[in-house]
Swiss-Prot record:
S-methyl-5'-thioadenosine binds at Q281, D360, D403, A404. This is Polyamine aminopropyltransferase. The gene is speE. Residues 257-505 form the PABS domain. Homodimer or homotetramer. Spermidine binds at H317, D341. One of its GO terms (molecular function) is spermidine synthase activity. It catalyses: S-adenosyl 3-(methylsulfanyl)propylamine + putrescine = S-methyl-5'-thioadenosine + spermidine + H(+). One of its GO terms (biological process) is polyamine biosynthetic process. The chain crosses the membrane at residues 22-42, 55-75, 90-110, 144-164, 188-208, 209-229, 237-257.
Length: 574
């Protein structure tokens, strides 16, 4: 009887223990979150480099998903699932932590190469070698994030098949729903990873985020070595390799952000003196020193795109603000949407309004121009406060931090009315920005503007993005406004344009034409410049009938803008 019981017990297949099962599924969930964060990290960085964030995101995610599928097939070639998984996570950790830094170094060197060659050969600054092989190398370097995306995608795609094989090998009986169980953990982990990205990692340095993410891949390798030591080939060697990479990750977490910033600084013409990652965007300030007692030139870049230069920002903001207020019957109550640097606000305050409301999403950006970061160089902080005339500390100013699309609804609900509205938003280079140029948004603003007031929208370049420029006017008209457009040269941007809209009475151009002088004196702007700004080439609007307004959900303006950007920059993602 006793012998029979032993025989029965020996014949019974061993089952996967609950501890190992929970451990493996937990590892799978964590790695899924890491994989999604790598997608976001690389696509976000690629968008900053290429200047086409939305296209970069879709391209990166598409490439990584396809690569993950190929990686799942390639996992068949790995004979030892235990050892293969440990080596895989070690490699993912190393590549994931170094991808951003190496990309920044290569692109930075590519941008500096023409200047290095010119300096070596004694060429003048206006004859930098930028064509031929140098131009090709620079272009190829911009696609390096996609190389990392494909490589990491291949390796991430191997994780699920290997975990599935490990689970099965730990049980003598066939595991029902093995794939479904693992995919369930994978999906949940990916969702958690997305939440971590949005809630935490967007606000920290991108290189630090990469190092932190890679540390979880490395931790998965450590756990496997500890738990399955007897099943792994050369565990001591792999443990030593993990310890070495741990040191690399610590170094990258501490020094990586400053190294990455130094490489990124090579992308700018002038010296980078301050950089900050807010929850919504990357802010970079540059400084160009000038001799002969002239003050330095400061510039702000958001996600790599120039927002203003202190050498000519007054031209842009004078044309944005003064025609608007001059065309308004009153200017006691003014609304500014965007304009978180306070430069337009400074010009508005010159009209002695009773109240100004500024609606901007990024509180961290506004804070830098109100009470600069202690880590910011003193000369820069003083320059910023001087540029905007310390406008944010004026008691007449109310700042609301909210998404403009929803924020204006709250103003409408309160029954607010404004004598003038100035919309100073970034170009519609992203679908989220596109809706702020839609007919629906302009109809909201129609509820806020006084019948005899004026509304002005910065409308991108009429030269580089003609269709987008005209589409803004047609969208305002669709919303019920009487629209005129004007333009002027801003040296840092080239030819730039604005759309000015009214509701009742004469249009803004006629109102301004009746003036004999500007109500306020300006060092740059004259009434003659304002009136002349409404003149366009004879054939400028000849194809306007074929240009569509930007209805909500159509993304029409976004596509016009992206097309113009691609043609101007020679950008082709495929």
């Amino acid at each position: 009887m006793h012998e029979s019981q032993l025989t029965t017990s020996a014949a019974k297949p061993s089952r996967l223990g609950w501890f190992d099962d929970v451990l493996l599924l937990g590892i799978m969930a964590v790695l899924a979150g890491c994989g999604l964060i790598y997608e976001y990290l690389l696509s976000h960085y690629a968008g900053r480099i290429l200047g086409a964030l939305e296209a970069a995101i879709y391209t990166m995610i598409g490439l990584m998903i396809v690569s993950m599928g190929l990686g799942a097939f390639a996992a068949r070639k790995i004979k030892d699932a235990f050892t293969g998984f440990v080596v895989l996570e070690l490699t993912v950790a190393l590549c994931g932590s170094l991808a951003i830094l190496i990309t920044a170094a290569v692109i930075g060197f590519g941008q500096q190469l023409p200047m290095l060659i010119a300096s070596t050969l004694g060429l003048p600054p206006d004859q930098l070698p930028e064509g031929g092989m140098i131009g090709t190398l620079q272009k190829l370097s911009e696609y390096l994030p996609y190389f990392w995306g494909v490589l990491l995608g291949l390796m991430i795609g191997m994780e699920i098949p290997l975990i599935a094989r490990v689970r099965q090998s730990l049980s003598d009986e066939h595991l029902l729903h093995n794939a479904g169980t693992i995919y369930g953990a994978d999906y949940i982990g990916a969702g958690i990873g997305a939440a971590i990205w949005v809630g935490f990692m967007l606000a920290i340095d991108i290189q630090l985020a990469a190092a932190l993410t890679a540390s979880f891949n490395l931790l998965a390798g450590f756990v496997f070595i500890w738990r399955f030591w007897q099943k792994i080939q050369r565990p001591k060697l792999l443990l030593a390799a993990h310890l070495v990479v741990t040191g690399v990750l610590l170094l990258l977490a501490i020094q990586g952000p400053s190294w990455e910033q130094q490489f990124n600084n090579l992308l700018y013409k002038d010296k980078v003196v301050y950089a900050k990652a807010t929850r919504f965007q990357q802010l970079t300030f540059t400084e160009r020193l000038r001799g002969n007692g002239l003050s330095p030139v400061y510039a702000l870049y958001i996600n790599g795109r120039l927002q203003f230069s202190s050498s000519d920002e007054h031209i842009y903001h004078a044309f944005l603000v003064h025609p608007t207020l001059a065309a308004s019957a009153r200017h006691n109550k003014v609304l500014i949407i965007g304009g978180g640097d306070g430069l337009g606000l400074k010009q508005v305050l010159r009209w002695e309004p009773e109240q100004v409301t500024l609606l901007d999403l990024d509180a961290a950006l506004v804070q830098l121009f109100k009470s600069p970061d202690p880590d910011m160089p003193e000369r820069l902080s003083q320059a910023l406060l001087s540029l905007n005339g310390n406008a944010f500390n004026d008691p007449r100013v109310t700042v609301i931090h909210d998404d403009a699309f929803n924020g204006v609804d709250k103003l409408i609900a309160k029954g607010d009315k404004y004598d003038a509205i100035i919309v100073d938003l970034p170009d519609p280079s992203h679908p989220d920005l596109n809706k702020l140029y839609s007919d629906y948004f302009y109809r909201k603003l129609k509820e806020l503007i006084s019948n005899d007031g004026a509304l002005t929208v910065q409308s991108t370049s009429p030269y580089h993005a003609q269709k987008a420029f005209i589409s803004v006017a047609k969208t305002l008209a669709l919303a019920g406004f009487d629209v005129k457009q004007y333009h002027h040269n801003v040296p840092s941007f080239g030819e730039w344009g604005w759309s000015i809209a009214t509701l009742d009475g004469k249009d803004a151009q006629h109102r301004l034409a009746q003036l004999t002088k500007l109500p306020i004196a300006d060092d740059w702007l004259t009434l003659g410049l304002v009136k002349g700004a409404f003149e366009f080439p004879a054939n400028f609007y000849q194809d306007a009938t074929n240009i569509k307004p930007n209805e909500l959900g159509s993304l029409q303006l976004y596509h016009y803008h992206q097309q113009a950007w691609s043609e101007t920059q020679g950008l082709d993602l495929f």
